Amino acid sequence: MPTSTQMKSKKNLHGILGVALLVCSEILMLKGIEPFASWFYYCAWWSYILIVDSLIYTIKKNSLIMNRGGEFLLMLFWSVFIWTFFEAVNLVLKNWYYVNVVAYRFIRWPGYAFAYATVLPGVFETTELLESLGVFKKSRVKPLSVNRYWIVGLLTLGIVSLGGVLLYPTYCFPLTWGFLIFLLEPINYLKGGTSILREWERGTLRKFYLLLLAGFICGALWEFWNFWAVTKWIYTVPFFEELKLFEMPILGFLGFPPFTVECYVFYNFISLFRYQRGWEEDTYGPNQGKRVKFPFAVGTFIAVSLFCLLTFSAMDEKTVNSYWPDVGELQMMRPEVLEYFASRGITTPHALLATIGSAQGKKELAQKCAISESEITRWVHLAQLSLVKGMGTRNAYVLTVIGVESFSDLAAQDPALLYDKLVTLAKEQLRPKGTAPPREAIVRLWVREARKKASNHQKVP
């Protein structure tokens, strides 16, 4: 245990770094400067983790990064695994998808890991901050007498919930954010690990309440920061596609609190295989001298890494809907025009619209490149189309094959019929190589968003 003098000697500067990174990335994102516009989510969450950890250290002179750095680094690894596990579940659920993802795999896959590594530190740091501030400090409940009926009941509920998620995902998808609690918490309790049930036996559910509140806070931040990023996720949750806050259906926010409890229980389960060493101040110290056997550690690392890589590959095929947009993929310009734009750094629909979106911009380009203004107007419409719900330039090009060349054209489509046409194109191999037709739920979102844009466009005098 470090002395008070040693603790005071530590430089608590990472919070300042976090604030600087958050402010700078926010400004650069709003200006549309890459890579901050696309990767704003990454910058925001790593900033948040640094800031919160610094606050915790300021309050109690003990924090995850400053005093439990080894556990923090290990947590990053398990955070990637745990969220990748839910990505694997989403291959069945189809509740969300990603847009405007970087096209190069050697960047994209590390990007997945870099983003998913923030999940556990984000929720656990928030939980510890709330605890440090004394939230729910005096909360007490009637002690629970845990018996075999509780254990069997929870395990049964977990098995039934998992079965429902896998077999009837359309109706049972909410159980995704709870089934691991029911499955793993009884095991944690029986094996003597850190357990919410054991705390309940002692007449307190403070940790449970803190986790729920931390989940709500982090959920709000997840959705808020995701909303502004170019590279982002979008939800296609059954029955709740229309009423949303940011990109999340309103009722979906109820899933974040139990998800945080699920992460806590999952991490405690993993800790059973590490002599019950945990991330919290009171569970980090015991058994520090004991180490997991090297073959077991290596085997675990290989198995987890292989699982993540296989899931990343499946996500590329099933969950990623669009890549970073490139105007060249719209196949609407002559090579010399593309070269002209490339020489000026105009390679994305956003940059194209900023250049030729106005009447003056169209006129100047028409004069320089000997192109009719009507042709330039078509480019503008296609660029606007590619931005509808992060559809991307590849999907926009496919829509042009079936006669949809603007968001007004898209707004006039019947979603079900349009989806059938896109499936037919895929069967006839008329889609760009390496792309799959979007799910019907995604097509519905496109059409709904296009109708909003068309309606707003008509209201403009």
Predicted segments — roles?
Residues 2-328, 332, 458-461:
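Aromatic-rich, lipid-facing transmembrane alpha helices and their immediate juxtamembrane interface loops
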Residues 317-461:
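C-terminal extensions
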